[in-house]
Structure formats: C-alpha cells, structure tokens
Amino acid sequence: MAIKVRLPASINQGDLEIDAEKLTVNQLIALLSQITGKDLEKILKRDGELSPFISIFVNGRNVRYAEGLETEVRSGDEVSIVPTVAGG
C-alpha cells in the first residue's frame, strides 16, 4: 500500500501516491518538494511550524490537533493539504 496525498492544483495536477511505510508530516513535505520540484517547505511552513494559511489532514484529522509536523503518516493513510479559507 501507499500513502495517498491530495494536493491543491496550485502545487500539483492531481493526487500522488507515495510508496513509504511510515513518515512524519515533516518528512512527507520534504519528499513532496523533491517530487513536485516546488519549495513546499517555504509554502507550507513558517518559522519551522505549519503555516496558518495551510491545513493538513491525515485521514480527516487536522494535524494541528495531533502531533503537528511530527504526526506520523503510514501506508494506507490519506493526507489532504488544503489552503485555509476565511471570509466575513
């Protein structure tokens, strides 16, 4: 099995499948940077933490309420990276 990653169209056209048994979200971001050729560390992180303008979900659970960037992602998990939207 693989880790399924859903990315916004601004980062990649379509979903990706990563062949890995276990990674942290931080390691996944570094790997996705290599695969997409985009500096996702700069886009998704600010001062070593997850940017307030991005939400990352592992199996529907926001990593901010888990272990943050150290949240483990395992084979068979689904990761969604979405821009945060606000309005008023």
Swiss-Prot record:
Entry-linked SUPFAM superfamilies: MoaD/ThiS (SSF54285)
S-S pairs: none
InterPro entries xrefs: Beta-grasp_dom_sf, MoaD_arc-typ, Mopterin_synth/thiamin_S_b, Sulfur_Carrier/Prot_Modifier, ThiS/MoaD-like
Organism superkingdom: Archaea
Classification via Pfam families: ThiS
Gene3D superfamilies: 3.10.20.30
Similarity comment: family membership: Belongs to the sulfur carrier protein CysO family.
NCBIfam families: moaD_arch
PANTHER family membership: SULFUR CARRIER PROTEIN CYSO, SULFUR CARRIER PROTEIN SLR0821-RELATED
Name by which UniProt lists this protein: Putative sulfur carrier protein AF_0552
